[in-house]
């Protein structure tokens, strides 16, 4: 069982809270252990000051042993705290990963079908993996580095205790580091935003090219396809080089900062010590400076670590922007929607108007269709007239701009659309066949027996083909059914639609690749089911026996009647029939 994401996620911090829910005590323990480790680290500068100012000048062996034991105990304690912190961080990190990734996948699969029109498969994949990258960016190592860097800033207070003048010098160097970090991070976020968008485009194009490789071969367009990919890839490489250049510049700066800081620090320290000696002031002395230098070393190391970590963490910004459409998307399922109950097969489209975009053309304009239980209804018309859009509306993939869709007198907008779909047998024009066995593809997750799968195969005229396969119903087929013929693929999709014996069957060009004998078998099987059938087809033999034929042209319903009635009228349908008979 995996927890679903909350209905709306406002920002990346909410994702972190969701992933670490139940591990708040571990996070607090990580912070406390980091603080204790930092406090133990502050013992070293003070012990150094006592060693130089008291133990060595006075040849105090007992004090020397005491300081040594304190430093050993400090090192052991700091290591123990660090190990415990790492274990707890790993536990939190694994918990976040095991909660977030399934929850985001669950959200993606539950989004409305209209959402997927806006993104290619490759682009969606990069957006999906962006959540995993965010989690990785906020990994335990990053958290520990960030906490250690923040806590190391406590040494700044110790520096002011030893010498406020040198502490101000350290503050000035820190200010320079902050400016460099802000500027470089701004540039990186801008470049990484472009890179993430480019990665999505490249992945989308790559998947399209792989899926369409046979079409590229037929049209001899491999060169143009490679040129299109290479253009995007070269831009990606350029952005990657720019990002690497900025990262390297920041790394060089952070490597040079401690060295330059030490040089400046020693120069100012010599000045301040000479001034103290000339005036007889008891201010800065050698022991105090060595202690200050130890505290400053920890402080400047924390500053550089913080600079590097902040730069990495800000890389979350473009990743979050990529992931937002998924994690902030509205799930299709709505617990407030009503259960449709057992559908009898009555369907009504009442004055439906639909367009895919608000500023786009009307796809359907005032279309009304009435289907009684058990009727066989056909929808025909020229290509692009809006026939397949009717199916998308019936399946709840799209929402009409105006008008209503009824199942058994119930408005689809108020029904649990997933419960409606479970009672439909659907064969879409672009139906997909998954990699797996014939049985898996026919059942498609439905709770049916092997015998019921065989019955569906017989009804679709596919049983004889399956019996000739090496492993029968358990024969593995490739993704997309590339090792099946076009007719076998269509019959497999038809068997999938009929396996649960639905009361409503929607078929979009489902028999275009079948011969007359096989189509007769399928038609006879559908008649025996006594189900409501709504069929889109250009094939005359498929729709000849329809109870009613609806003719759509340019999104408008222009004719309704039986096959013979429409042919006798001499309208659009008659012209479509004449065109096929020529």
Residue map of PLM features:
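Loop segments that connect adjacent transmembrane helices in multi-pass transporters
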Residues: 102, 106-123, 194-242, 315, ...
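Transmembrane helix-loop-helix hairpins at lipid-water interfaces of multipass membrane proteins
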Residues: 27-81, 88, 160-165, 263, ...
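ABC-family ATPase nucleotide-binding domain "signature/switch" substructure
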Residues: 389, 422-430, 438-441, 456-460, ...
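Membrane-integrated ABC transporters
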Residues: 1-44, 57-67, 85, 89, ...
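A hydrophobic transmembrane-helix motif
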Residues: 44-50, 142-185, 241-290
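Primarily ABC-family ATPase nucleotide-binding module
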Residues: 327-378, 411, 455, 524, ...
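Cytosolic ends of transmembrane helices, especially the final helix of ABC transmembrane type-1 domains
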Residues: 198, 202, 214-221, 245, ...
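Helix-to-loop junction immediately C-terminal to a conserved catalytic motif
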Residues: 395
């Amino acid at each position: 069982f995996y927890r679903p994401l909350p209905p709306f996620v406002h920002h990346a911090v909410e994702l972190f809270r969701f992933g670490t829910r139940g591990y708040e005590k571990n996070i607090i323990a990580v912070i406390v252990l980091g603080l204790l480790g930092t406090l133990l680290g502050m013992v070293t500068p003070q012990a150094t000051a006592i060693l130089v100012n008291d133990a060595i000048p006075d040849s105090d062996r007992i004090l020397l042993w005491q300081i040594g034991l304190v430093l050993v105990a400090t090192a052991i304690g700091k290591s123990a705290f660090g190990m415990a912190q790492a274990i707890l961080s790993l536990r939190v990190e694994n918990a976040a990963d095991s909660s977030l990734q399934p929850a985001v996948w669950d959200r993606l699969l539950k989004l409305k079908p209209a959402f997927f029109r806006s993104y290619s498969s490759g682009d969606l994949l990069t957006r999906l993996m962006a959540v995993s990258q965010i989690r990785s960016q906020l990994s335990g190592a990053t958290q520990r580095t960030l906490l250690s860097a923040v806590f190391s800033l406590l040494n700044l207070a110790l520096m002011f205790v030893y010498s406020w003048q040198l502490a101000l010098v350290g503050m000035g160097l820190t200010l320079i580091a902050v400016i460099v970090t802000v500027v470089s991070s701004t540039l990186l976020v801008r470049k990484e935003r472009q890179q993430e968008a480019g990665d999505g485009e490249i992945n989308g194009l790559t998947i399209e090219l792989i899926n369409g490789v046979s079409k590229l071969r037929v049209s001899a367009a491999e060169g143009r396809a490679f040129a299109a990919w290479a253009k995007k890839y070269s831009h990606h490489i350029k952005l990657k080089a720019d990002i690497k250049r900025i990262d390297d510049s920041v790394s060089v700066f952070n490597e040079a900062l401690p060295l330059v800081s030490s040089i400046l620090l020693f120069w100012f320290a010599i000045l301040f010590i000479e001034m103290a000696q000339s005036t007889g002031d008891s201010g800065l002395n050698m022991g105090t400076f060595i202690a200050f230098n130890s505290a400053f070393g920890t402080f400047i190391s924390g500053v550089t670590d913080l600079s590097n970590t902040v730069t990495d963490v800000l890389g979350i910004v473009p990743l979050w922007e990529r992931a937002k459409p998924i994690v902030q998307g509205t799930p299709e399922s709505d617990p407030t929607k009503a259960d449709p109950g057992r559908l009898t097969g009555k369907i009504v489209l009442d004055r439906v108007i639909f367009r895919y975009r608000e500023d786009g053309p009307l796809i359907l304009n005032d279309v009304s269709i009435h289907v009684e239980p058990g009727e066989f209804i056909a929808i025909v018309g020229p290509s692009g007239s809006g026939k397949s859009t009717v199916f998308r509306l019936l399946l709840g993939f799209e929402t009409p701009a105006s008008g209503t869709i009824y199942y058994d007198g119930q408005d689809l907008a108020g029904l649990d659309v997933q419960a409606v779909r479970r009672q439909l047998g659907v064969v879409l024009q672009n139906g997909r066949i998954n990699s797996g066995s014939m049985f898996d593809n026919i059942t498609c997750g439905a709770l049916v027996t092997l015998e019921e799968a065989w019955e569906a195969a017989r009804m679709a005229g596919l049983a004889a083909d399956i019996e000739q396969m090496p492993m029968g119903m358990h024969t593995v087929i490739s993704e997309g059914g590339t090792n099946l013929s076009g007719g076998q693929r269509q019959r497999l999709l038809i068997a999938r639609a009929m396996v649960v014996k639905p009361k409503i069957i929607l078929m979009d060009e489902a028999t275009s690749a079948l011969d007359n004998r096989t189509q007769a078998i399928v038609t006879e099987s559908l008649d025996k089911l006594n189900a409501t059938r709504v069929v889109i087809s250009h094939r005359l033999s498929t729709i000849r026996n329809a109870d009613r034929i609806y003719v759509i042209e340019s999104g408008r319903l222009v004719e309704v009647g039986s096959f013979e009635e429409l042919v006798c009228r001499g309208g659009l349908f008659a012209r479509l029939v004449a065109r096929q008979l020529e």
